[in-house]
Each structure stands twice: as C-alpha cells, then as structure tokens.
Amino acid sequence: MSSKEQKTPEGQAPEEIIMDQHEEIEAVEPEASAEQVDPRDEKIANLEAQLAEAQTRERDGILRVKAEMENLRRRTELDIEKAHKFALEKFINELLPVIDSLDRALEVADKANPDMSAMVEGIELTLKSMLDVVRKFGVEVIAETNVPLDPNVHQAIAMVESDDVAPGNVLGIMQKGYTLNGRTIRAAMVTVAKVKA
C-alpha cells in the first residue's frame, strides 16, 4: 500500500487529519487570545489617555495666555489713552493762575475810563484766546451759578442767605474751577445759598 492509499481507522487520509487539527487549533487560538490581555494594549491605552490629557492642558494653557495677552493689550491701550488725555494736566495747572490773573484784572479794570479801553480790550482778547486754546485740549470752565452744589466740581466756601437762589444751589463763584476731559483738575470755590433765618 502506498502512502496515499493509507487510511486511518476512520477512513481519512493523514493529510486530512492534519488539516482538520490545524483548523481546530486556529479556532481555539482566538478564544485564548481574547481571554489574555496583552500588556502592550494597556500601555498604549494609558499613553493615549496621557496624551489626550496633555493636549487638553496645552490647549487650556494657550487659551489662557491668549486671554492674558488680550487683557494686557487692552490695559495698555487704556493707559496710553489716559496718558494722552491727561498729559497736559500739569501744564494746564500752571496756566490756571495766569487765567485767574487775567480774570481779576478784568474785574477790577475801570471799563468806563476811555484811556483804559485799549488795555481792557487787550486783556479780554488775551483771556479769550487763552481759553480757546485750552478748550481745544479738553479743558472746560466751571463757573455756573444757580445750579445744585456738586461736590465733584464745587468746593463750598460759605453759606449765604438768599431769596433769589434755591437753597443748596451755587450762589456765587469765588474762583473758577476747571475740568480736563471730564476730570476735575480744580474745583470751583463757591458760595452756596441757604434759607433766610
């Protein structure tokens, strides 16, 4: 009998038996490997989780830095804007006594005297041009009467009885006040009306 003709007791050729056994082993191997967890898979999953966490931290850090830079840019712009607005404050404060002197000169000048008219006119023009110049840079005069006393722009010097002005309102200006771009640089010294006793 040749090897091809040899039959096993069940009547199968040896090659068929080997093939059947090989298929059974292949069928069993996936079940065994499914039960066993490869440590490399755990490590890969752990590393992927760490990577995702690191990426999230990095994204959050970048967003925080961007927000901080934007806030810094805004603060810098505001600081520059304030510096531009109020850079003249010291200079204006030095000019205020000159303006006050011109005001006082006009108050005491003898306007009825024809010999003084040229000088009075010169003082008036000088004061007007000086006020026009400072107004261009955001300076406003606080000199209104019969308005409610505002502690932000008025400094009450005295209380005076009055029938003409409502109590608590500004009766008279003793010294003009000034604001620079809405901020008081010198409060007006005023007298305030009160009810007659």
UniProtKB/Swiss-Prot annotation:
The gene is grpE. This is Protein GrpE. Signal peptide: none annotated. Gene3D superfamilies: 3.90.20.20, Head domain of nucleotide exchange factor GrpE. GO terms for biological process: protein folding. Homodimer. Residues 1-39 are annotated as: Disordered. One of its GO terms (molecular function) is adenyl-nucleotide exchange factor activity. Belongs to the GrpE family. InterPro entries: GrpE, GrpE_coiled_coil, GrpE_head. SUPFAM superfamilies: Coiled-coil domain of nucleotide exchange factor GrpE, Head domain of nucleotide exchange factor GrpE. Disulfide bonds: none annotated. It comes from the Bacteria.
